[in-house]
Amino acid sequence: MNICDNRIAANFLKKMKILITGGCGFVGSNIAVFLKKKISKVQIDTLDNLSRKGSKLNLLRLKKYGIKNYRYDIGNYSKVKRLPKYHFIIDCCAEAAVEVSKRDVDRVLNTNLVGTFNLLKKCAENKSNLIFLSSSRVFSIDL
């Protein structure tokens, strides 16, 4: 059974507030648009620092659906803490490019590790649910 096809679930979700991190990326923006098309009354916001190519184009598409973006760095807890309370946070944010991981380890750790920890703290404070999506790329570091 598809949750979006179930009327009871759809009525329940209309009252939901959902934040999608990495929401202007490929995966995040498609999830946001899919949910908005299926359940138009659900409040969907995104959090994205717009640092990747294509993010600004996706932002324009999201605006057409009434989806607001917070241009924050997920690794900055003082910004994450200011976000409103959400029922669900869908974490699509990741620094997944292998080349970036080789030349800017701090950036990768700040986004992928510290950022996820910041979301967990925010969820714990607000009793929100977290849906975590992993990177499409897994790589190792030679020690």
Regions found by a protein language model. Name each.
Residues 1-143:
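N-terminal Rossmann-like NAD(P)+-binding domain of SDR-like oxidoreductases, especially those catalyzing
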